[in-house]
Amino acid sequence: MKKMSRWLGGLLAVLLLAGTCAYAQAAPGAVQGSVTVRSAAQSGGMESDELLEGYLYQAAGMTPRVSAAAAAARPALYAVPMQPLTAEVYSGLLPEIREIAAGTRASTQIQVPVSIAYTKEELGVTGTLVADGAITSEANAKISARFRQDLAVDTLLNQLLLRNPYELYWFDKTVGISAGCGISCTGEVCTIVQVTVSMPAAAAYQGGSELTVDTAKTGAASAAAQTAAAVVAGQQGSSDYEKLRAYLTYITGEVSYNSGALAAGTAYGDPWQVIYVFDGDSSTNVVCEGYAKAFKYLCDLTWRSGDPAVQCLLATGTMDGGTGAGGHMWNIVTIGGRNYLADVTNCDTGTAGAPDLLFLCGVRGSATQSYTAAAGGREIRYVYDDHTRSVYDTELELSDTAYDPDAMTPMELLTALTRYVACITDVCPAGADVNGDGQVDADDMTALARTITG
C-alpha cells in the first residue's frame, strides 16, 4: 500500500512539473497522451514599472494613462479574431489573472476546463488512433497540429497583453506562455477536458519558482489603492484647499526622505515609490518621485471630472537647494484659475520648506528659464527639463503670489453675482449673501466689487 502511494505521488509530481492538465475520465480501453504548445516571447510595449503604476490607478477605478502610439494601435488589434478554443481559454484565464494581480492567488499555472473531441475523420488519420496500448505517431502528430491550430497561443498572449496590460504587470512577457493538455484516445475519438496555461512571473515578483508569485508583493498595489481611497474619503466635505493641505500632511507624516536611495542614484520610474507612501510601513521611505506621485495620485482620486476644479501635474527637472542640488520631481497644482508650485518633498520635516513654505507658494522667474521660491531665508531654484517642457504648455507658467484660500476666484465671483441677480428676481439661492450679514442687498454688490478690485 505504501509503495502504491509513493508511486501515485511520484506520478502526480511528474504531471505537475510537465505542466500538463488533467485527463478526461478514461473510457474502457482508452490510452493517454499529452500535447504542449509554446508562444513566442514578447518584446516592446510598456515596461513592468509602467504597468504596475497603471494597475495602481486601475485598482482605484481610474483610467491609466496610455501613450498615443499604444492607443492608436488598439482598435486594429482588438479586431483580430480568436478561434473558439482560444477565446474559451482566454475567458477562463481572466479571473485567475486578476486574482494573481490582486495578490489573492500565488500559482501562475492556470487550469481551464474545456470540452474537445477529435474523431479520426476530423483529424484525417488514415490508420488507427491507438495501437499496442499507445497513441500512434500519426495520430499524435495530427492531434498536435490540430491543437496548435485551435489554440493559437501567440494570438492568446497578444490579446491578453493588449486587453489586460495592467493586470499582467507581474508576468514575464520576454519568456512567453505555454499551454498543455492531456489527451484520452479510444479507437475512434480523442478527448481533451482541460488546458493548463503556464505564465512565468517576472523575477521581481516570483515566489518560490517562476510559476508562482510572492503575494505580499502582488497584493501591495491593491492595498495601497484601498488606503489612498480611505484618505480621500476622510476629506469628504472639506474645501478643495483643505483637501490639498490634508494630502500634504498625510504624505509627510507617512514617509521620510530616503537619502540612501538618492546616494545610490535611484532613477525615476519606480512605481513602488507610490506604494511605499500608503503601505503603513515606516521603514519603506521614498525620494522626490514618491512624494510627488503620491500627491498626484490622491488628487487624481479626488478630482476625476473632465474639467476638474483642481488639477495636479508632475514636473521633472533640476532643483538647487532644498534636499540638495540635482534631479528633482515636484507638482504643479492648478486651482482658482492659476498654477502653483507644490514641492511636497521639501515640505517634509527637516527640509528648507517645512512644513508648507513650498506648497502653493508664489515664485519669480519664467517657465523658459527658471523659477525661484523663497523658503526660510533660502532661495530654491527650479528648472524644467526638456521632457516636461514638451508635455505641457501654459500649465508651466506659475503664479507669482501664493494661493489665498480666502480670495474668490473669477468663477466664484461669477457664481456669486449670478446668485445675487437671481435673488433680486426670484428666490434667493444659498451664497447670495456675499458679505455674510444675514441679508441680501446693495452691500453685497459692494463686497463683490471690493473683491474684484482687491
Language-model regions: role of each:
Residues 233, 249-257, 296, 300-304, ...:
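Sec-exported extracytoplasmic/periplasmic mature domains
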